[in-house]
Design a protein with these regions (language model features):
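Extended beta-strand/beta-hairpin segments
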Residues: 1-24, 31-111
Length: 111
């Protein structure tokens, strides 16, 4: 697997970059956590339920920093239920645990 820096960092933008791979892993992990907390809460998720993670990268005076925007698509639920499950999933997701206090992470739910 060959990686390339994103255009934002002077790369060609072709192929995969570490941020893309990180977002794919985070999204898959968060979806698993979401399904777990839904099951434990006796909430049935629709098959169309999905998670997208957008990873941002920026530079400060001395280094680079990441940020993550996690968007859950939970079409079978109310907005309140969806937001509650997203919050619970964020507490148990291993990627969220690993990034907590290290990068800015936001979550949102769409129904």
């Amino acid at each position: 697997l060959q990686t390339r820096p994103p255009k934002e960092m002077g790369g060609s933008g072709e192929g995969v970059n570490p941020e893309l791979l990180f977002s794919a892993g985070y999204a898959a992990c968060f979806l698993g956590a979401l399904r777990l907390v839904a099951k434990n809460s006796d909430v049935q998720l629709d098959d169309a339920t999905s998670v997208t993670v957008q990873i941002g990268i920026g530079k400060d005076d001395t280094s680079f920093a990441l940020s993550a925007n996690i968007i859950g698509y939970l079409p079978a639920l109310s907005q309140q239920q969806a937001e509650e499950l997203m919050g619970k999933a964020n507490q148990v997701c291993p990627y969220s645990k690993a990034t907590r206090g290290n990068i800015d992470v936001t979550t949102s739910a769409k129904v």
